[in-house]
Amino acid sequence: MWMACSSVGVSARSMLLQRASFRACNSHRGLATHLARASASSSALSNKPPLKTPPQSVPQVASDDLPMISMDDRKVAIGWDTRTWSRFHNIWLRDHCRCPECFHPITKQRLVNTFEIPPDITPSQAEPTADGLRVSWPSSQPHVSLYPWSWLQRNSYDPALKQRETQLEKIIWSSKIQASPPTVTYEEAMAEDERGLYKWLSHVDHFGMCFISGVPPTPEATEELSKRIGFIRETQYGKFWDFTSDLAKGDTAYTTLALGAHTDNTYYTDPCGLQLFHLLSHTEGSGGSTLLVDGFYVASILKELHPDAYSVLARTPVPAHAAGEPSEFYQPYPASGYPVLTHDPVTGELIQVRWNNDDRSVMNNLDPYQVEAWYAAIRTWHKLLTSADSEYWVQLGPGTAVIVDNHRVLHGRSAFTGRRRMCGAYIGVDEYRSKLAVLREKFNPNPDNASGPETTRSIWSPAL
């Protein structure tokens, strides 16, 4: 879900967003308060031998409030009340048994052989208990399974009773965010207890970017800051980069030219997730302001005001390439590329913006009737991207690094003179998401996610 941040202001044009179910928030102070309330807990794995189940905390239901159960040869139906029922296929229930014989309590991997389950399997009994639905399977494959009520409600698919788990709420922002941009200090990010790291990555998850102040103006300190999140991803530019405008690489970034708002790696099948960069020095010149644009904010306006253009950008693949080095040639697979806007196929949520007009290849994949509509759509997209309402300009200096979600926030710069020294790194989206998920378990655990005094990850975790 997207939220419009009231503290960053909204123009008359973007007020339309509020009618499109965007809720206002009071800047990111609410997030800071939320983080301050989070309690720490150990995340160490249990040392118990395999197949010995760690204590699993299963919420109980009073016997008077037990759901009603009905079953036939295909499904088990659960009546939560007189009006709400969930139906689960028998084979689905058997496949999702999480006893130690069917689901490893330590590795959290499936042990049951899905393909040995008879397709027409039918329980011999299904009964409600305080701990959950207890299912006894037929004598041909004798087994007993227990499913907590909260787990069944969360995973109900016929019908879906709860909104599918998505990423944390995204706070979309305009240029007005310059009044109070999300920021953490270097000391917070590097603190051993990882609370500051959780605050940092939570800002990135909410806003798609975050500044880090007080960074020692050295490549070594910046590299350690990058590694705080996860492995640095190596590309044709190396692992950790430290560069100037000397065209050491065949890319416009290695010049003094202006760069329009873009995401990196559109020529990759899997663009890098995060990009951190730090201006170490700028001597004998001027210019070089950093440009940041929230692609989700711009996409929300495009969808509200120009739904046809939005649809074109969501369905039309755009080929791309990186061909500035004679010994290298990059293009995504398939070569037809990917749309500018990518959505979760289940929830419909916008999950990625992929846009760099400079790296775009020949658009020879358009049908004749699509050509004019596509150019009209990217013209509208460009107009919104480059509006004063969308563009957040900031002059970085030594000691202040910025990290952006390369799947959401576009970046660029103004032209400059003199000599600039910049360093930074890419971090994979999966490494970033893994670190954030682990820190969330540690500092803001879901009641269904932890079990026992050791707070090991529960087999009933919503993420599993």
What residues fall within each predicted segment?
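Motif-centric detector for short Cys/His coordination patterns
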Residues: W2-E192
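Active-site environment of non-heme Fe oxygenases that use a 2-His-1-carboxylate facial triad
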Residues: E169-M209, G214-L464
